């Protein structure tokens, strides 16, 4: 297993519901190193660009509105097998289907408000990390 990076966001519901500390704690306890992190807010245009891969999907407009409604925490994480291990840590998109001990099981309230985003591939992790962090912000 090679050490690599993944990207995550604590979504507006996770921030609004006061779960930043709990989620970050779960991430670090799972062995991830936080190499970049910031509190920010996506504009509608930012959210449209970030999620443009979903533009043709029926939930796109709702997703863009949700992701731009309040602050998020964006982070780049490092660990052996980072993408796969983080996807396991966050759990299924639907918190009702998420395994016990996962972030979404503990902090998500619905499919739409599922607390966190995690990259689905090494390639997307690099793209998503670069979207939120300039090279000088990545350590």
From Swiss-Prot:
<dbReference type="GO" id="GO:0005737">
    <property type="term" value="C:cytoplasm"/>
</dbReference>
<dbReference type="GO" id="GO:0006228">
    <property type="term" value="P:UTP biosynthetic process"/>
</dbReference>
<dbReference type="GO" id="GO:0004550">
    <property type="term" value="F:nucleoside diphosphate kinase activity"/>
</dbReference>
<keyword id="KW-0597">Phosphoprotein</keyword>
<dbReference type="GO" id="GO:0046872">
    <property type="term" value="F:metal ion binding"/>
</dbReference>
<feature type="binding site">
    <location>
        <position position="11"/>
    </location>
    <ligand>
        <name>ATP</name>
    </ligand>
</feature>
<keyword id="KW-0963">Cytoplasm</keyword>
<keyword id="KW-0546">Nucleotide metabolism</keyword>
<feature type="binding site">
    <location>
        <position position="104"/>
    </location>
    <ligand>
        <name>ATP</name>
    </ligand>
</feature>
<keyword id="KW-0460">Magnesium</keyword>
<keyword id="KW-0418">Kinase</keyword>
<feature type="binding site">
    <location>
        <position position="87"/>
    </location>
    <ligand>
        <name>ATP</name>
    </ligand>
</feature>
<keyword id="KW-0479">Metal-binding</keyword>
<keyword id="KW-0547">Nucleotide-binding</keyword>
<dbReference type="GO" id="GO:0006241">
    <property type="term" value="P:CTP biosynthetic process"/>
</dbReference>
<dbReference type="Pfam" id="PF00334">
    <property type="entry name" value="NDK"/>
</dbReference>
<feature type="binding site">
    <location>
        <position position="93"/>
    </location>
    <ligand>
        <name>ATP</name>
    </ligand>
</feature>
<dbReference type="GO" id="GO:0005524">
    <property type="term" value="F:ATP binding"/>
</dbReference>
<comment type="function">
    <text>Major role in the synthesis of nucleoside triphosphates other than ATP. The ATP gamma phosphate is transferred to the NDP beta phosphate via a ping-pong mechanism, using a phosphorylated active-site intermediate.</text>
</comment>
<protein>
    <recommendedName>
        <fullName>Nucleoside diphosphate kinase</fullName>
        <ecNumber>2.7.4.6</ecNumber>
    </recommendedName>
</protein>
<feature type="binding site">
    <location>
        <position position="59"/>
    </location>
    <ligand>
        <name>ATP</name>
    </ligand>
</feature>
<comment type="similarity">
    <text>Belongs to the NDK family.</text>
</comment>
<dbReference type="InterPro" id="IPR036850">
    <property type="entry name" value="NDK-like_dom_sf"/>
</dbReference>
<comment type="subunit">
    <text>Homotetramer.</text>
</comment>
<dbReference type="GO" id="GO:0006183">
    <property type="term" value="P:GTP biosynthetic process"/>
</dbReference>
<dbReference type="InterPro" id="IPR034907">
    <property type="entry name" value="NDK-like_dom"/>
</dbReference>
<feature type="active site" description="Pros-phosphohistidine intermediate">
    <location>
        <position position="117"/>
    </location>
</feature>
<dbReference type="InterPro" id="IPR001564">
    <property type="entry name" value="Nucleoside_diP_kinase"/>
</dbReference>
<keyword id="KW-0808">Transferase</keyword>
<keyword id="KW-0067">ATP-binding</keyword>
<feature type="binding site">
    <location>
        <position position="114"/>
    </location>
    <ligand>
        <name>ATP</name>
    </ligand>
</feature>
